């Protein structure tokens, strides 16, 4: 159920007049998620929902789709024309209103309000402010139910990755040919046994393919060969729209032990992961941002001589979408200067990608009680291998 009171509280804390949700064709996923509008609902006409800092919200709908916001509180206004729609928004906002809306110069993932509509709203005398901070408060943190589902998924993924590597090890010992798609299928089966669902094939990358952070195999993919680095990246959740994802990455070598170069790269990414986690734990009370946490990991990797192997941010928000709408650990791609806060859930996944291979280690963390807690089982401290590495 949509917590309109929580939305209003966030608006007041931001010092704004209100938050304008505006959608058509379900283009604004944030509006749908925040307000609990089902994707199956007809949305061929625009609707607006204005939550004020104080007072009653206003539901503005087209007469042909009057029920799309019926589950929400507030005064109902029905429109049949473009002029009616914007007149109703202007009347609900009031003179000199400062309204949050879904746009951002920093985060394209939050930018759903089109420029033309923004211009029309500004002609009404409305000052528009990015909703990027409000989104974190209302969609980018986990409640107790979401946290519990995330923790269960994280533990299950930990078991799955070890079961998958055990099967890889057994196949190698028996001389069986194994391709990347085989491992993907094994993991899909393990997900089903564990009662997990996901949104696509997991990442399995062998040899030079491990240097591609978002690699996708063609047909059966590459055969796993002796000496290969094998990168596994798994994400899944329990069934249900309110369930929260977990997302982990483990890496191994198809050999009894890694080469010296493989060991150096692995040590760099593990050390970067630990540096980011330590910085978050130490900096939460001072309002540490996602960008600051990212820089800790990046700086360590650069000091180890692998700055040229950096390809992506250190982590992303996690929610009911595997890439959620909370704070990201990012100082480069889309620098995130929003502070990590109570209920923030995110990955910590530094990686180094060279010409012959790449490596990434990924754990998930949640801020609870002012502390960082890493979820799931024990985090990876040594490479998986064909000897005793686990």
What is the role of each PLM region?
Residues 1-390:
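Active-site neighborhoods and metal-handling regions in enzymes and metal-associated proteins
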